[in-house]
C-alpha cells in the first residue's frame, strides 16, 4: 500500500528549518569524532537542506515492535508516560523474588508463629540444664568467683532464644542449635570440639549446624549485612548441610566485623565451654576457621564498620573450600561451590537489562522507502600540502552533496508516547519483506528496480569516487559490474547497499580547461563519501534506532 507524504509541510516553515539545523549539527559533530587522514586537516559542515523531491513510501507489514524498543534507558524518566509505574519491571528479578518467597516465609516462622513450640522446648531444656551451665562447671584455680553479672544474664537469655535489648550485634544472639530444638542435649560439645580443631568431619558435625551455633538468627539480627541475595545461599547451604532444618540461617560474603566484647567471651568461656577456654585461646584456635569460612562471621578484633571486599571473600572462600575438601570435609566444599555459583548468578542478574511492559496497543509498521531526491549538504575540508615540507599549508576544499539515491526498508514503532525509527540492513530487509515475486523476478532487483546492480556495487568495499570534468563526483561501480547484475542464488536476490548513489560537487582554487588544479581532491571526495555512508549506517540502521516523543 503506497502512502503519500506531505513533504512540504514537514520540511518547510520554522519547524522544518529547525529540524534541518539539528541534522546539520548532528552530522558536524560526527565528523569531529572521525579520525582524519594525514592529508586532511579538518572537516566542517555548513548547511543542510531537505530538497523538494519527497521519498516514496510503501507499507509492507504491521507487526509487533522489536524487543529492543522495549529496553529501558537508565537516564530516562518514564513516569510521565506510564500511568502505572510498576509496569516497568525486570522479568528475572520477579522470578528470583518468587523463588525466594518460601525462604522468607521460613524466616518469619522462626520468629513468628513457630516460635511458641520451639520456645517451650527451649525453656524446658534450659531450666533443666541451667545448673550445669551456670554453676555446675568447676571454677578454674585462681579464677574469680562467678557472680550473676549482666553478661551471665545475656548468655542465659540467649539460651532461651530471647533477644537481649542491650546487645543486638553479638554473633551469639538468638542461638538455636539442632540438639536443643530436637529435644536432646545441648550441642555445646559440637561448638567446643569444632573450635578446638578435634578433626570431626562434616558428616559428624554439620558445618551449617556449627555456624548456626555461632551465629544464630537471621542476618538482620546478628550484625551481618542483610541483602536480598541471601535467600539463594540459604537454600543451597541448607540443602548441603542438612543441619538447620530451615531455621533461616543466612551466610553472606559481604559482611561487617562482628562486635564481641571481652565480657561476653569471658562469660562464654566460664559458663558455656566447660571453664577451660579463655578468650585468647578461643581467638587463637578458631581465628583461621572463623575468618576464612564463608558461612561463619569473622570474630577477629577488627575496626567496627569496615567490611572485606566481596572479591577477596570469594577468593578466600574458594581456597578454603579446597583445603577443607582435601581434609575430608565434603559438605564445606559443596557449600562453598554453591555459594560461589549464587554469587556469580546474582552479579549477572544485577547487570541484566530491564524491559518495559508490553501493551496490546503497541504496533510497528514496516515500510519500503525509495528516494532519489535533491537533498543538499554543504561542507568544507582543509587539505594539507606537503611541499616544500610536510603539512606546509592548508587549502580549503568546498564539497557539496547535491543528491542521493536510496532504496531500503524502514521500521516505525509506536509505543506509548514514543516513536522509534530505524532502517534495516539488506539482509534483515530481505527477511522482513520476503523474496522477489514472480512478477518482479525478471527485474533488476528484488523490488523491480533496474539500478539494483549499481546499488550492490556501491555497497562493496571496492567502490570508488569518479570525478567528472564538470567537478561532479559519484560513487561508481567497480570494473565489470553493470546495472541489473544482482547476485542471485536459488531464485532469491540480494539487496544492495542502502545508499546507492551520492552526488558530490567540489570546488577548489582556479579551474583551467575544466580540470582540477590539485590531484588529491579525488581522495578528499572519496573520504567524505565513505564517512557519510558510515555515519548513516551506524546511526540509522538497526540495531541503532532513533526515538521521538509524541
From Swiss-Prot:
Any Pfam family hit: MMM1
Comp. bias (Low complexity): 125-140
Keyword Chloroplast applies: no
Domain of life: Eukaryota
Keyword Nucleotide-binding: no
Biased composition (Polar residues): 148-157, 251-269, 278-289, 296-323
Keyword vocabulary terms for this entry: Endoplasmic reticulum, Lipid transport, Lipid-binding, Membrane, Mitochondrion, Mitochondrion outer membrane, Transport
Subcellular location: Mitochondrion outer membrane; Endoplasmic reticulum membrane
Compositionally biased tracts (Acidic residues): 69-90
Segments of this protein annotated with the region Disordered: 62-168, 218-356, 474-493
Membrane topology recorded in Swiss-Prot or TrEMBL: Peripheral membrane protein
Assigned GO CC terms: endoplasmic reticulum membrane; ERMES complex
Domain named SMP-LTD: residues: 1-550
GO molecular function annotation: lipid binding
GO terms for biological process, alphabetical: mitochondrial genome maintenance; mitochondrion-endoplasmic reticulum membrane tethering; phospholipid transport; protein insertion into mitochondrial outer membrane
Function of the protein: Component of the ERMES/MDM complex, which serves as a molecular tether to connect the endoplasmic reticulum (ER) and mitochondria. Components of this complex are involved in the control of mitochondrial shape and protein biogenesis, and function in nonvesicular lipid trafficking between the ER and mitochondria. MDM12 is required for the interaction of the ER-resident membrane protein MMM1 and the outer mitochondrial membrane-resident beta-barrel protein MDM10.
Family per similarity comment: Belongs to the MDM12 family.
Subunit structure: Component of the ER-mitochondria encounter structure (ERMES) or MDM complex, composed of MMM1, MDM10, MDM12 and MDM34. A MMM1 homodimer associates with one molecule of MDM12 on each side in a pairwise head-to-tail manner, and the SMP-LTD domains of MMM1 and MDM12 generate a continuous hydrophobic tunnel for phospholipid trafficking.
Domain notes: The SMP-LTD domain is a barrel-like domain that can bind various types of glycerophospholipids in its interior and mediate their transfer between two adjacent bilayers.
Protein name as catalogued: Mitochondrial distribution and morphology protein 12
Upper taxonomic lineage: Eukaryota, Fungi, Dikarya, Ascomycota, Pezizomycotina
Gene: MDM12
Amino acid at each position: 500500500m503506497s502512502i503519500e507524504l506531505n513533504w512540504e509541510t514537514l520540511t518547510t516553515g520554522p519547524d522544518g528549518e529547525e529540524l534541518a539545523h539539528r541534522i546539520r549539527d548532528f552530522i558536524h559533530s560526527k565528523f569531529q569524532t572521525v579520525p582524519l587522514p594525514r592529508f586532511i586537516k579538518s572537516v566542517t559542515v555548513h548547511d543542510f537542506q531537505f530538497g523538494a523531491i519527497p521519498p516514496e513510501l510503501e507499507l509492507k507489514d504491521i507487526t509487533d515492535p522489536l524487543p529492543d524498543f522495549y529496553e529501558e534507558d537508565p537516564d530516562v524518566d518514564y513516569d510521565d508516560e506510564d500511568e502505572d509505574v510498576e509496569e516497568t519491571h525486570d522479568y528475572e528479578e520477579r522470578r528470583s523474588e518468587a523463588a525466594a518467597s518460601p525462604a522468607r516465609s521460613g524466616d518469619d516462622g522462626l520468629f513468628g508463629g513457630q516460635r511458641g513450640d520451639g520456645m517451650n522446648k527451649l525453656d524446658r531444656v534450659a531450666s533443666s540444664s541451667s545448673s550445669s551451665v551456670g554453676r555446675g562447671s568447676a571454677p578454674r584455680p585462681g579464677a574469680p568467683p562467678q557472680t550473676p553479672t549482666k553478661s551471665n544474664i545475656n548468655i542465659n537469655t540467649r539460651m532461651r532464644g530471647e533477644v537481649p535489648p542491650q546487645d543486638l550485634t553479638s554473633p551469639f544472639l538468638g542461638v538455636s542449635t539442632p540438639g536443643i530444638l530436637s529435644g536432646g542435649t545441648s550441642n555445646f560439645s559440637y561448638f567446643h570440639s569444632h573450635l578446638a580443631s578435634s578433626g570431626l568431619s562434616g558428616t559428624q558435625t554439620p558445618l551449617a549446624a556449627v555456624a548456626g551455633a555461632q551465629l544464630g538468627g537471621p542476618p538482620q539480627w546478628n550484625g551481618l549485612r542483610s541483602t536480598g541475595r541471601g535467600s539463594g545461599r540459604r537454600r543451597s547451604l541448607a540443602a548441603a548441610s542438612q543441619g538447620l532444618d530451615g531455621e533461616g540461617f543466612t551466610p553472606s560474603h559481604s559482611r561487617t566485623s562482628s562486635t564481641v566484647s571481652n565480657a561476653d567471651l569471658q562469660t562464654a568461656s566460664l559458663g558455656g565451654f566447660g571453664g577451660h577456654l579463655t578468650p585468647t585461646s578461643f581467638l587463637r584456635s578458631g581465628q583461621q576457621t572463623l575468618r576464612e569460612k564463608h558461612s561463619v562471621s569473622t570474630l577477629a578484633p577488627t575496626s567496627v564498620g569496615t567490611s572485606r571486599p566481596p572479591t577477596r571473600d570469594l577468593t578466600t572462600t574458594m581456597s578454603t573450600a579446597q583445603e577443607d575438601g582435601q581434609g575430608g570435609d565434603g559438605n564445606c566444599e559443596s557449600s562453598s561451590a554453591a555459594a560461589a555459583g549464587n554469587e556469580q548468578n546474582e552479579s549477572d542478574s544485577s547487570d541484566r537489562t530491564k524491559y518495559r511492559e508490553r501493551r496490546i496497543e503497541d504496533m510497528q509498521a514496516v515500510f519500503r522507502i525509495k528516494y532519489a531526491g535533491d537533498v543538499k549538504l554543504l561542507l568544507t575540508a582543509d587539505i594539507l600540502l606537503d611541499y616544500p615540507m610536510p603539512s606546509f599549508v592548508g587549502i580549503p576544499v568546498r564539497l557539496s552533496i547535491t543528491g542521493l539515491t536510496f532504496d531500503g526498508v524502514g521500521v516505525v514503532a509506536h509505543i506509548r508516547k514514543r516513536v522509534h525509527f530505524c532502517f534495516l540492513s539488506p539482509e534483515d530487509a530481505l527477511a522482513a519483506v520476503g523474496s522477489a515475486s514472480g512478477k518482479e523476478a525478471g527485474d533488476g532487483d528484488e523490488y523491480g528496480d533496474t539500478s539494483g546492480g549499481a546499488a550492490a556495487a556501491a555497497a562493496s568495499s571496492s567502490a570508488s569516487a569518479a570525478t567528472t570534468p564538470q567537478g561532479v563526483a559519484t560513487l561508481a561501480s567497480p570494473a565489470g559490474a553493470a546495472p541489473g547484475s544482482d547476485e542471485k542464488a536459488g531464485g532469491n536476490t540480494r539487496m544492495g547497499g542502502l545508499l546507492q548513489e551520492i552526488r558530490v560537487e567540489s570546488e577548489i582554487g582556479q579551474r583551467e580547461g575544466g580540470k582540477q588544479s590539485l590531484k588529491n581532491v579525488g581522495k578528499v571526495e572519496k573520504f567524505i563519501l565513505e564517512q557519510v555512508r558510515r555515519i548513516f549506517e551506524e546511526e540509522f540502521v538497526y540495531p541503532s534506532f532513533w526515538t521521538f516523543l509524541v
